[in-house]
From Swiss-Prot:
Protein name per Swiss-Prot or TrEMBL: 6-phospho-beta-galactosidase
An annotated GO cellular component: cytosol
NCBIfam families linked: lacG, PRK13511.1
SUPFAM superfamilies: (Trans)glycosidases (SSF51445)
Enzyme Commission number(s): 3.2.1.85
Length: 470
């Protein structure tokens, strides 16, 4: 039976400033840590990425033509405040006014994120969000944007607080490239949640029009053997690191007893302690019911086994299937040999995990209000067919179809899901995979910056028009 989605459902496309804009040092933009990190460690940079800084009218015209009625955009903090604080860069401000005006001209609603992995380099060098001064600077930046851009009706504070701490201090594939430091992981999570809560409270107290929320990446964690207590415990601990800790902070305004027991166990095995003050808890508590929506980014699930060895993570950056290893001291190890399809980058394709995660939020955090699926999509080595000027990305269509079907199921079962943003609108630069891993509805020739609709774009257009998942 063909499933349908609600009439007012947002069929969106997602982007991020650093992954799409290019123009990394144009018109007064300040540096971010990624600029130096990529130059020193990788064979690619974010220049020119998808040249969205100049090509946004083309991408928004395509959005309108193909039924995309929402777009996730992030403001580059260092385009507004080159040093993260102090002097404002007027050309950066002007750019975003023009961008939002073009969105509205094309009837594409902008959902605007204040921070998408791109803390200004000056602040990043000074400890990023481990330094509590950065919290103050972020809140000042947020307030400036709320005042300056009243044309924005949907704000999110952060994109993926979990993967920021994870990438910077656990896996070590984000600058500053530190591995297995759980104290920094949890402290980063916590401090960013305090920054989020302060910004949300400020938005509500200031009487700004519109809505505000946060985007969390929520990969679902399962025990490899549900009858094995060690596997069950490993899944619980992995869930605390990636999901429960930040969800508790968002919607409980504190950390539940089970969450803190798990955190203390991980820190007792690996070393370190958290600095959480009474004032922090008061800030979290004051904002817990003020979030208008939750953005869920979902790509994959993981299956966990018990593990008592040392930490070792091998990140698959090349797209050679089978190149991943992930085992954490005091937590568990991910089992990749499961009967579930996976991408070339070893990401497990499991739509049921999205359904389970949505319903977990509904059950455990009933003050969630509403949900947008703010990222979901398939990274692929797309093959451009020159004679047809397109890509036959049937695997992507199938992936999105399966995930939309479980979203429809979740809505039937009581979840208030209001929209879906495919990652990504057009092909963009990938943080740890460069330009080979493509996600877009529109193929980007990175040499010429020409855009070509893929087969998935035509499929998505029909979906947006009919609301039927075919």
């Amino acid at each position: 039976m063909t499933k349908t989605l609600p009439e007012d459902f947002i069929f969106g496309g997602a982007t991020a400033a650093y992954q799409a804009e290019g123009a990394t040092n144009t018109d007064g933009k300040g540096r971010v840590a990624w600029d130096t990190y990529l130059e020193e460690n990788y064979w690619y940079t974010a220049e020119p990425a998808s040249d969205f800084y100049n090509r946004y009218p083309v991408d928004l015209e395509l959005s309108e033509k193909f039924g995309v009625n929402g777009i996730r955009i992030s403001i580059a903090w260092s385009r507004i405040f080159p040093n993260g604080y102090g002097e404002v860069n007027p050309k950066g401000v002007e750019y975003y006014h023009k961008l939002f005006a073009e969105c509205h001209k094309r009837h594409v609603e902008p959902f605007v994120t204040l921070h998408h992995f791109d803390t200004p380099e000056v602040l990043h060098k000074d400890g990023d969000f481990l330094n509590r001064k950065t919290i103050d600077y972020f809140v000042d930046y947020a307030e400036y944007c709320f005042k300056e851009f009243p044309e924005v009706k949907y704000w999110t504070t952060f994109n993926e607080i979990g993967p920021i701490g994870d990438g910077q201090y656990l896996v070590g594939k984000f600058p500053p490239g530190i591995k297995y430091d759980f104290e920094k992981v949890f402290q980063s999570h916590h401090n960013m949640m305090v920054a989020h809560a302060r910004a949300v409270k400020l938005f509500k107290d200031g009487g700004y029009k519109g809505e505000i929320g946060v985007v969390h990446a929520l990969p679902t964690k399962y025990p490899f053997d549900p009858s094995n207590p060690e596997d069950v415990r490993a899944a619980e601990l992995e869930d605390i690191i990636h999901n429960k800790f930040i969800l508790d902070a968002t919607y409980l305004g504190k950390y539940s007893r089970e969450t803190m027991e798990g955190v203390q166990h991980i820190l007792s095995v690996n070393g370190g302690k958290l600095n959480i003050t009474d004032e922090d808890y008061a800030i979290l508590d004051a904002a817990k019911d003020l979030n208008d929506f939750l953005g869920i980014n979902y790509y994959m699930s993981d299956w966990m086994r018990g593990y008592d060895g040392e930490s070792e993570i091998t990140h698959n950056a090349t797209g050679d299937k089978g190149g991943s290893k992930y085992q954490l001291k005091g937590v568990g190890q991910r089992e990749f040999d499961v009967d579930v399809p996976r991408t070339d980058w070893d990401w497990m394709i499991y739509p049921q995990g999205l359904y389970d995660q949505i319903m977990r939020v509904v059950k455990d955090y009933p003050n969630y209000h509403k949900i947008y699926i703010t990222e979901n999509g398939l990274g692929y080595k797309d093959e451009f067919i020159e004679s047809e000027k397109t890509v036959h990305d049937d695997a992507r269509i199938d992936y999105v179809r399966q995930h939309l079907n479980v979203i429809a199921d979740a809505i039937i079962d009581g979840a208030n899901v209001k929209g879906y943003f495919i990652w990504s609108l057009m092909d963009v630069f990938s943080w740890s995979n460069g330009y080979e891993k493509r996600y877009g509805l529109f193929y980007v020739d990175f040499e010429t910056q020409e855009r070509y609709p893929k087969k998935s774009a035509y499929w998505y257009k029909e979906l947006a028009e009919t609301k039927e998942i075919k």
